[in-house]
């Protein structure tokens, strides 16, 4: 179903300039496909993912954990825009693979906190660095104001897709 602001209203037709921008998006898609992703993934992480039948949806949890403190399953669900049962299932698979660890929140024993297993921190950091190289090279060529504009546009797009 096309994204519309109002139910039943057809989406607006893009301008020629907008068509040129939208036309760039499919050119990025192969970079996010399985073979390219697997080639960039460190062996330890790739083996754990493949051995335990983990999918890109499981992989989407990992950068969230790399960036900071342990997260609750509810916070993971919120960030990934998935249901709580789905987030719980994703965390369960990652936990069985040994990629993440689950612990009780000392402040609330009913709440489970999820963190990246230390053995997988360095491989995941390497993977994120490899995946980010083309983007970081592109950003290097932009002025600070162009970077700010790029970030604003990308953030707005993510917001639209997720809402």
Predicted regions and their residues:
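Ser/Thr-centered flexible coil motifs
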Residues: 15, 55, 84, 117, ...
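Terminal interaction helix/tail motif
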Residues: 2-3, 13-31, 122-163
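Short, flexible segments with low predicted structural confidence
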Residues: 31-34, 47-49, 66, 92-93, ...
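N-terminal leader segment of winged-helix/HTH proteins
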Residues: 1-53, 116
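Charged, amphipathic alpha-helical coiled-coil/dimerization segments
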Residues: 6-8, 92-149
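N-terminal helix-turn-helix DNA-binding core of bacterial DNA-binding proteins
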Residues: 38-83, 97, 113
